[in-house]
Amino acid sequence: MLQAEMIVFVGVILWMCVFSQEPSSKVMADRYAVFWNRTNPRFQRGDYHIDVCINDYLDVYCPHYEDSVPEERTERYVLYMVNYDGYSTCDHTAKGFKRWECNRPHSPNGPLKFSEKFQLFTPFSLGFEFRPGREYYYISSMITETGRRSCLKLKVFVRPPNGCEKTIGVHDRVFVDDKVDNALEPRDDTSHEAEPSRSDVSTSGLRHQTSRPLLALLLLCISLYLLL
């Protein structure tokens, strides 16, 4: 009788361990890619905005060019985080501060990528903390070859918690890759890296799916050994 109860107990533990790894039961982070250049049609309309949740990521990709493109034809930007007035007038001097700098248009490792994590608290002195229900603004400006000032701006709204219930089963962009592929060292909680390849995402999902059967097999072997 004791052996039968042990088998039932081990079976319940095994079931809980396996199904607790199901993707549908996990709340994950989304990533939002923004290609920061004048040819992006979403910037041309002047109303580029995204809605995010706490712990989501914003990935800003800088302009990147082949070596054959001369320096004077490349785009370079300094991105600022500003208040609403700075966003409306595209002026970073009023309560704004520099966030990132796109200054390597010929980077050998591909386009520079700057990642912002929308988190409530940060352990870094140069990090930034975000609050649900508020808007945040990013801008950059440059003088074009025609002498006109080009202003690119982005509005980010952090949704309240009741609007952020999501699971991996209904969201596509959920793989968070903290690997730094480029040669820049982050000074805060901003990561600097080259554009990830599609293989990084697909292999990550494959490893996640294959780990569950292996875990089940391992637990089954342990339980059988204990019953002998």
Swiss-Prot record:
Keywords, alphabetical: Cell membrane, Developmental protein, Differentiation, Disulfide bond, Glycoprotein, GPI-anchor, Lipoprotein, Membrane, Neurogenesis, Signal
Bias kind Basic and acidic residues: ranges: 184-198
A Gene Ontology biological process term: regulation of focal adhesion assembly
Keyword Glycoprotein: yes
SUPFAM superfamilies: Cupredoxins
Disulfide partners: C62-C102, C90-C151
Lipid-modified residues, GPI-anchor amidated serine kind: S204
Region: Disordered, residue numbers: 184-205
InterPro entries (alphabetical): Cupredoxin, Ephrin, Ephrin-A_Ecto, Ephrin_CS, Ephrin_RBD
GO molecular function: ephrin receptor binding
Keyword Glycoprotein: yes
Tissues/organs with expression: Widespread expression in the embryo.
Family: Belongs to the ephrin family.
PANTHER family named among the record's database cross-references: EPHRIN, EPHRIN-A5
Function: Cell surface GPI-bound ligand for Eph receptors, a family of receptor tyrosine kinases which are crucial for migration, repulsion and adhesion during neuronal, vascular and epithelial development. Binds promiscuously Eph receptors residing on adjacent cells, leading to contact-dependent bidirectional signaling into neighboring cells. Induces compartmentalized signaling within a caveolae-like membrane microdomain when bound to the extracellular domain of its cognate receptor. This signaling event requires the activity of the Fyn tyrosine kinase.
Protein name: Ephrin-A5b
UniProt gene name: efna5b
